[in-house]
């Protein structure tokens, strides 16, 4: 490249002039420099000039005359654009010189134009007082620096002067010892601390984001640290968040909770019986605390009061009473129409049970006097009217039902203790039962009444069951149902009812150990060993449940008299095997009752009903009798064994039902099985009593 340039320089006639002009115009990078260089043919001038940036060349050309400059630029640049591939970098003169060669081929045609341009450049240089010969050397730098084209100074000079002088080995990117100091990765490199320190301030000065309002949402403000007034809290949260201990403030929220089975217990408490809740939970010990129960216990005035007393005295009923106190109040009258009540009350019980119970039980206790009993007897027909008012009470009962369930487990133990005095409680019941026996309808209305007297209660229950049966299928089905349903129908009617059935079953099972068990089954509140007999109650309850089932069936509208009940009994039997298999599924039968009615039609004449007997149906006592006779040890041994016994026995009768009837219950029970699990959560506490029953049975 240098040789070619030299040749060009020697060949060009305008060596120095063109050289000067070339050096002047050569400052343009590739295109401009090469064009002017080739045109001028200035060898020495073209080389340094070509190293200069294009900017210099452009400035020079602008200085040159317009015509020559435009022609020169058009030719050189167009060619440069075409042949620009030869030019690799702005800093290498060799490439620029190549460009010159390429252009030099065309120089002949261009020389004229370029010579004009060079002349113009020379004239401009002369105007500046620079000599052409000097233009190759210092003149170029001086002149261009004066022109503002300092960059035209040869890159070599620039690099030689600036690069080596100012760049250290670690600062020269071309030097292997170069230390990068910029970039995220090197910002913490301590090897060049002095410069890094200099650079860091710059970075510090920059703020990529603003923190001014960053913590406004969570800022500590002294004026906000003082406790807020109640008005402020209510304005902020809608209620006083600090009053969790204050039932008045929280009632609305707690009232919402009772939607669930167990919450109903809480709900009634929230409704205004928090103390009564504790009383209910106290169960047997809480006889006094449940004011309504206390009134009824003290009053012992009526069958209803008896049933309430049972809850009181029975401790079993205690929990139950808790769930049934209102039931007693509005329900004793409604008990005659208990079936309807159960349906409506079970639903409303949970809602109203606690509040209703508290208010209604107390007045009911006095009202429950023997007159109320008689009332119940008379109300058996008039149960429907009573049912309407009791429905609210029963709703309370509903709540208390789940509560009763829970308290029952607790109460079951206490009730066992207290109910080992069940004869006395039953004595109380007996006292009430004596009059109650007079109005079996009343007893029917008060499904709890059967528990009144163990023996008398059983007989009365049988009679009442008969009456209830009679009344039941007709118009009192609701009343008897409540009694029988009490364990079963209530559960049937209310979703949570089945779990209560276990409670009743427990009560029944507890009483099943004794002659009064059946009546106690009906009047679960009195059951002496409420919890342990759970299985017994389930076992007998299965037989009894048939009655209950029948009750529910009647409730469902199976007003058919004992025969359908028998069918129900059979189905209950069929169901019983399932309960035997699934003691806690005995509640499952509850849902089955609705399903059972069809099976009832199938099994009414079948042997199972015979074994269970229509009496079994209408007389839970009969069932108890059957259970007790069938299982003399059923009371004690029955609890665990009875499930097997009941199951096989039920199967024996099921041989009859073993055909379609058995399948129907099985299928039905399959459906109940889901429901038993639902109930099971509440009766979970009841399961242990069955084990106790097993131990008792084994003993």
From Swiss-Prot:
SMART domains: Btz. Residues 93-128 form a coiled coil. Residues 107-117, 124-135, 155-175, 208-231, 242-252, 338-352, 410-419 have a biased composition (Basic and acidic residues). One of its GO terms (molecular function) is mRNA binding. Keywords: ADP-ribosylation, Cell projection, Coiled coil, Cytoplasm, mRNA processing, mRNA splicing, mRNA transport, Nonsense-mediated mRNA decay, Nucleus, Phosphoprotein, RNA-binding, Spliceosome, Stress response, Translation regulation, Transport, Ubl conjugation. Residues 134-280 are annotated as: Sufficient to form the EJC. The keyword Phosphoprotein applies. The coiled coil domain may be involved in oligomerization. Required for pre-mRNA splicing as component of the spliceosome. Core component of the splicing-dependent multiprotein exon junction complex (EJC) deposited at splice junctions on mRNAs. The EJC is a dynamic structure consisting of core proteins and several peripheral nuclear and cytoplasmic associated factors that join the complex only transiently either during EJC assembly or during subsequent mRNA metabolism. This is Protein CASC3.
């Amino acid at each position: 490249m240098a040789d070619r340039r030299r040749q060009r320089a020697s060949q060009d006639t305008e060596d120095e002039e063109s050289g000067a002009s070339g050096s002047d115009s050569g400052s343009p990078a590739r295109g401009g420099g090469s064009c002017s260089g080739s045109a001028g043919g200035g060898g020495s001038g073209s080389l340094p000039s070509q190293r200069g940036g294009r900017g210099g060349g452009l400035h020079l050309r602008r200085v040159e005359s317009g015509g020559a400059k435009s022609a020169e630029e058009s030719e050189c640049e167009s060619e440069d654009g075409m042949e620009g591939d030869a030019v690799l970098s702005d800093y290498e003169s060799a490439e620029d010189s190549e460009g010159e060669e390429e252009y030099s081929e065309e120089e002949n045609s261009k020389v004229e134009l370029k010579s004009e341009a060079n002349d113009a450049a020379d004239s401009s240089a002369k105007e500046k007082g620079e000599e052409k010969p000097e233009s190759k050397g210092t003149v170029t730098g001086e002149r261009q620096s004066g022109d503002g084209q300092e960059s035209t100074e040869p890159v070599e000079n620039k690099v030689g002067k600036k690069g080596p002088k100012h760049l250290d080995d670690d600062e020269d990117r071309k030097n292997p010892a170069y230390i990068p100091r910029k970039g995220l990765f090197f910002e913490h490199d301590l090897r060049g601390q002095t410069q890094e320190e200099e650079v860091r301030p710059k970075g510090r000065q920059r703020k990529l984001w603003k923190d001014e309002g960053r913590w406004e949402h969570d800022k500590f403000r002294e004026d906000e640290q003082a406790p807020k007034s109640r008005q402020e809290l209510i304005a902020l949260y809608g209620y006083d968040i600090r009053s969790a201990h204050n039932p008045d403030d929280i009632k609305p929220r707690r009232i919402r909770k009772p939607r669930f089975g167990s919450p109903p217990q809480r709900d009634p408490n929230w409704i205004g019986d928090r103390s009564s809740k504790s009383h209910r939970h106290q169960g047997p010990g809480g006889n006094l605390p449940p004011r309504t129960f206390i009134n009824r216990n003290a009053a012992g005035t009526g069958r209803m009061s008896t049933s309430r007393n049972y809850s009181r005295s029975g401790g079993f009923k205690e929990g139950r009473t808790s769930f049934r106190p209102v039931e007693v109040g509005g329900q004793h009258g409604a008990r005659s129409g208990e079936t309807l009540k159960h349906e409506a009350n079970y639903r409303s019980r949970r809602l109203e049970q606690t509040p209703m119970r508290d208010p209604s039980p107390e007045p009911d206790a006095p009202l429950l006097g023997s007159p109320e009993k008689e009332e119940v007897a008379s109300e058996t027909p008039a149960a429907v009217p009573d049912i309407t008012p009791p429905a609210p009470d029963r709703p309370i009962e509903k709540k208390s039902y789940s509560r009763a369930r829970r308290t029952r487990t607790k109460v079951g133990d206490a009730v066992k203790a207290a109910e080992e005095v069940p004869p006395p409680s039953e004595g109380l019941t007996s006292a009430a039962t004596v009059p109650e026996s007079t109005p079996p309808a009343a007893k029917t209305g008060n499904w709890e009444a059967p528990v009144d007297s163990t023996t008398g209660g059983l007989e009365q229950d049988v009679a009442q069951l008969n009456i209830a049966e009679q009344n039941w299928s007709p118009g009192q089905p609701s009343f008897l149902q409540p009694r029988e349903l009490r364990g079963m129908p209530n559960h049937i009617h209310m979703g949570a009812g089945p779990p209560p059935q276990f409670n009743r079953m427990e009560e029944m099972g507890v009483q099943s150990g004794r002659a009064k068990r059946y009546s106690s089954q009906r009047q679960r509140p009195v059951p002496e060993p409420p919890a342990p007999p759970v299985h017994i109650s389930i076992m007998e309850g299965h037989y009894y449940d048939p009655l209950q089932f029948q009750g529910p069936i009647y409730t469902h509208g199976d007003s058919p008299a004992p025969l359908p009940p028998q069918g129900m009994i059979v189905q209950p039997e069929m169901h019983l095997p399932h309960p035997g298999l699934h003691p806690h599924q005995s509640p499952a039968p509850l849902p089955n009752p609705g399903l059972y009615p069809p099976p009832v039609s199938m099994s009414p004449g079948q042997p199972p009903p015979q074994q269970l007997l229509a009496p079994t149906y209408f007389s839970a006592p009969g069932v108890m009798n059957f259970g007790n006779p069938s299982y003399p040890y059923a009371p004690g041994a029955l609890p665990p064994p009875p499930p097997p016994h009941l199951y096989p026995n039920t199967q024996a009768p099921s041989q009859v039902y073993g055909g379609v009837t058995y399948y129907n219950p099985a299928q039905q029970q399959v459906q109940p099985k889901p429901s038993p699990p639902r109930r099971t959560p509440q009766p979970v506490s009841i399961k242990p009593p069955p084990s106790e029953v097993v131990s008792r049975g084994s003993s």
